């Protein structure tokens, strides 16, 4: 939702239906009108978009601790996203996924560590990737 004021349209795709309901409620409560959410597999959603010739300028991805899937990352590359914002809670899977995305034509432009859980060992890392295609 934070990107909605910078975009013509924002689409959120999430497997967890309760999270989708919460996101819809939050968008309504905050008066965000150029956003829609759907429950489903984000990789399949991106594949369908690419098959229809649609593209996204920016893809935000926040995979589980196990990291992303090659299917999802292939879909990101296929649809021609110019930038990817990758949020990760696991530095090991982040490194693995960045290596894969590099093979798909993305380069890391910057990375930021966010201490969302003070006094714990947990961190979030946000990486900005740019397509070199």
Predicted regions, residues:
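Rossmann-like S-adenosyl-L-methionine
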Residues: 1-133
């Amino acid at each position: 939702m934070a990107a909605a004021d910078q975009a013509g349209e924002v689409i959120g795709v999430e497997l967890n239906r309760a999270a989708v309901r919460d996101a819809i409620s939050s968008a309504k409560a905050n008066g965000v009108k150029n956003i829609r959410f759907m429950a489903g597999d984000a990789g399949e959603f991106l594949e369908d978009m690419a098959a229809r010739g649609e593209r996204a300028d920016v893809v935000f991805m926040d995979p589980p601790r196990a990291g992303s899937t090659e299917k999802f990352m292939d879909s990101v590359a296929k649809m021609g996203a110019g930038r990817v914002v990758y949020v990760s809670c696991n530095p090991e899977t982040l490194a693995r996924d960045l290596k894969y995305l590099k093979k798909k034509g993305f380069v890391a432009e910057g990375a930021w560590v966010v201490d969302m859980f003070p006094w714990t060992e947990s961190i979030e890392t946000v990486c900005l990737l740019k397509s070199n295609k």
